[in-house]
C-alpha cells in the first residue's frame, strides 16, 4: 500500500494540473506551505514539479487542496450562471409571441402591397384609361422620384413641409355632393397670369401647376398666422388632397362603365386604390408648396408675353412694373400716371411726367433718359385727352402726382391705333359704349386743349420714371389702389 500511494498521488497531481491548465487557472505555492482558497492559482505544466523539487518542498497536500478549491470555484460559478440560463429559456416563448406581432412599419408595407395589387387589378378593368387620365399629372410627378429641382434649391429648406407621411382614406368619410372645382381667387385675377408664369419658371417640368393651384398656394402664403403656420398649411394641403380624391371619385361615378366595376371590387382593393390616389395628390401639393414658399413668385411676378407689346415698345421694356405687395393686393392703381407719346410718324418715344399746378393749366413734360433716342427732329406733338381706341393691346394704368385742385386725367398717345387701359377691377376702353365703367372720362372743355404746349421747358432732371408697356410708372409715388 505504501508503494502505491506515491503513484496514485503522482497521477492525481498530473490530472489536477491538466484540469487546472485547461481551465486557465494556475496554482501558486508559498514558502510557508499554505495556499488560500481565494488566491490559489495554478502554474503551467512547464514550471511545476512533483515532490522533491528544489522550488517546492513537500507541497503535495497543498497541491491537492488547491485542485479541490479550483474545482469548487468553477462549480459555484456554473451554479450562479444557471438561473440566467433558465431565465433566457423562459423568455424564448415570449420572444416568439412578440415576433408574431407585426410592427407599424410592417403594416405600412402591407398596405403598400395591397395598394400595388389594387392598382394592377384596376389596370385590367375596362375604361381604366379614363380613371388614369384623371390623375395623370400626379402620376407623372411621382415618376421623377422627387429629385431636388435645380431651379428651386434657393431658399431655406428648413421651413419646407416634409412629405414622408403616408395618408389613409379610412380616416375620413366620403361625400361626393357639394364639391366644386378649384377656381382662381377673385383677389388674384389681376395678377394671376404673371404670378403663374413666374411659378412655372421655378418648377420642374413634371410638376406643371395650373392657374387655380397657383392661386390656392398664393392664398396660403397670405394667411395671417402668428404661430405654427406650417402646421396649418399642412392640414390644408391634406384636406385639399382628400378633396381631389373625392373629385376623382365623382368623375369615375359619372362614367357608367367604370362605376359598376368599381362597386364589384372588394373593400380592401378599393381602399388601396384610394390610398394610392390620395398620396399621389398630397405629394404633388407638398412639392408645389415648398417651391412656392422658397421662391415667392407672387412677390416677383414674371412679365407678360412680349408678343403683346405694342409697336414702338419692344426690347427689354417690362410688360408691367410691379412692386412688392405683401398684403396680396393687386399692384395696379386705378388712376393712370402718364403715357408714352409718339410723333406724327410714330418714330419717337418720350418719357413724360405730369406736373399739375394748383390752377390745373400747365403741364411740364421731360426728355427721356439716355437709353431712348429721339429719331425725329420734329416738334413734340401734344397729347390728346380722349383718343378713339379699339383693339386687344392693353397697357396698365398708374396713379399720378397731382394737387387737390387738379382733376385726374387719362393720358394716351395721339397715334390712332389699338390702345386700352387695364385697371385693377376691369378692362376699360375710351371709345364710349364699350366701356362699362369710365372713371377717367374727360369733360368737353378739355377735348381740344393740348396738355403740353410747344413752349414747354423740357429738362432731363425731371425724368424719374420707368418706361413700361404703353405707360410710365413712378415707383416712388406708388400708393395703394383706390376703388373707383
Swiss-Prot record:
<feature type="compositionally biased region" description="Polar residues">
    <location>
        <begin position="327"/>
        <end position="346"/>
    </location>
</feature>
<dbReference type="GO" id="GO:0042025">
    <property type="term" value="C:host cell nucleus"/>
</dbReference>
<feature type="compositionally biased region" description="Low complexity">
    <location>
        <begin position="402"/>
        <end position="413"/>
    </location>
</feature>
<feature type="glycosylation site" description="N-linked (GlcNAc...) asparagine">
    <location>
        <position position="175"/>
    </location>
</feature>
<feature type="region of interest" description="Disordered">
    <location>
        <begin position="324"/>
        <end position="463"/>
    </location>
</feature>
<comment type="similarity">
    <text>Belongs to the RxLR effector family.</text>
</comment>
<dbReference type="GO" id="GO:0005576">
    <property type="term" value="C:extracellular region"/>
</dbReference>
<protein>
    <recommendedName>
        <fullName>Secreted RxLR effector protein 104</fullName>
    </recommendedName>
</protein>
<feature type="signal peptide">
    <location>
        <begin position="1"/>
        <end position="24"/>
    </location>
</feature>
<keyword id="KW-0732">Signal</keyword>
<feature type="compositionally biased region" description="Polar residues">
    <location>
        <begin position="418"/>
        <end position="428"/>
    </location>
</feature>
<keyword id="KW-0843">Virulence</keyword>
<keyword id="KW-0325">Glycoprotein</keyword>
<comment type="function">
    <text>Secreted effector that completely suppresses the host cell death induced by cell death-inducing proteins.</text>
</comment>
<feature type="short sequence motif" description="RxLR-dEER">
    <location>
        <begin position="48"/>
        <end position="65"/>
    </location>
</feature>
<keyword id="KW-1048">Host nucleus</keyword>
<keyword id="KW-0964">Secreted</keyword>
Amino acid at each position: 500500500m505504501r508503494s502505491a500511494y506515491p503513484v496514485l498521488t503522482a497521477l492525481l497531481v498530473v490530472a489536477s494540473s491538466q484540469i487546472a491548465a485547461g481551465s486557465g487557472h494556475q496554482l501558486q505555492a508559498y514558502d510557508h506551505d499554505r495556499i488560500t482558497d481565494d488566491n490559489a492559482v495554478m502554474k503551467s505544466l512547464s514550471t511545476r514539479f512533483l515532490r522533491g523539487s528544489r522550488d517546492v518542498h513537500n507541497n503535495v497536500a497543498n497541491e491537492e487542496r488547491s485542485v479541490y478549491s479550483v474545482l469548487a470555484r468553477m462549480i459555484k460559478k456554473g451554479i450562479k450562471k444557471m438561473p440566467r440560463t433558465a431565465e433566457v429559456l423562459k423568455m424564448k416563448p415570449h420572444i416568439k409571441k412578440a415576433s408574431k406581432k407585426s410592427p407599424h412599419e410592417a403594416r405600412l408595407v402591407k398596405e403598400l402591397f395591397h395598394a400595388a395589387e389594387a392598382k394592377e387589378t384596376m389596370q385590367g378593368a375596362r375604361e381604366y384609361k379614363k380613371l388614369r387620365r384623371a390623375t395623370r399629372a400626379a402620376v407623372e410627378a411621382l415618376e421623377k422620384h422627387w429629385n431636388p429641382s435645380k431651379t428651386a434649391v434657393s431658399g431655406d429648406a428648413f421651413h419646407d413641409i416634409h412629405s414622408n407621411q403616408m395618408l389613409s382614406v379610412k380616416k375620413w368619410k366620403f361625400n361626393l355632393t357639394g364639391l366644386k372645382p378649384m377656381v382662381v381667387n377673385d383677389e388674384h385675377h389681376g395678377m394671376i397670369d404673371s404670378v403663374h408664369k413666374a411659378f412655372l419658371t421655378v418648377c420642374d417640368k413634371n410638376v406643371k401647376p395650373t392657374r387655380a393651384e397657383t392661386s390656392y398656394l398664393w392664398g396660403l402664403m397670405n394667411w395671417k398666422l402668428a404661430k405654427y403656420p406650417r402646421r396649418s398649411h399642412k392640414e390644408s394641403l391634406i384636406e385639399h388632397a382628400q378633396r381631389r380624391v373625392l373629385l376623382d371619385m365623382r368623375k369615375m361615378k359619372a362614367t357608367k362603365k367604370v362605376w359598376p366595376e368599381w362597386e364589384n371590387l372588394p373593400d380592401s382593393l378599393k381602399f388601396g386604390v384610394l390610398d394610392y390616389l390620395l398620396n399621389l395628390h398630397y405629394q404633388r401639393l407638398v412639392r408645389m408648396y415648398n417651391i412656392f414658399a422658397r421662391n415667392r413668385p407672387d412677390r416677383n411676378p414674371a412679365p407678360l408675353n412680349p408678343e403683346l407689346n405694342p409697336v414702338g415698345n419692344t426690347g427689354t421694356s417690362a410688360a408691367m412694373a410691379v412692386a412688392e405687395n405683401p398684403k396680396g393686393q393687386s399692384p395696379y392703381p386705378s388712376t393712370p400716371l402718364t403715357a408714352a407719346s409718339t410723333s406724327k410718324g410714330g418714330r419717337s418715344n418720350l418719357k413724360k411726367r405730369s406736373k399739375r399746378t394748383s390752377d390745373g393749366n400747365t403741364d411740364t413734360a421731360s426728355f427721356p433718359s439716355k437709353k431712348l433716342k429721339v429719331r425725329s427732329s420734329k416738334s413734340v406733338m401734344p397729347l390728346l385727352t380722349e383718343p378713339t381706341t379699339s383693339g386687344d393691346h392693353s397697357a396698365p394704368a398708374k396713379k399720378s402726382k397731382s394737387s387737390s385742385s387738379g382733376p385726374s386725367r387719362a393720358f394716351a398717345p395721339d397715334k390712332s391705333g389699338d390702345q386700352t387701359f387695364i385697371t385693377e377691377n376691369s378692362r376699360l376702353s375710351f371709345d364710349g359704349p364699350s366701356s362699362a365703367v369710365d372713371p377717367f372720362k374727360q369733360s368737353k372743355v378739355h377735348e381740344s386743349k393740348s396738355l403740353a404746349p410747344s413752349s414747354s421747358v423740357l429738362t432731363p432732371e425731371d425724368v424719374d420714371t420707368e418706361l413700361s408697356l404703353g405707360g410710365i410708372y413712378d415707383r416712388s409715388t406708388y400708393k395703394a389702389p383706390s376703388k373707383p
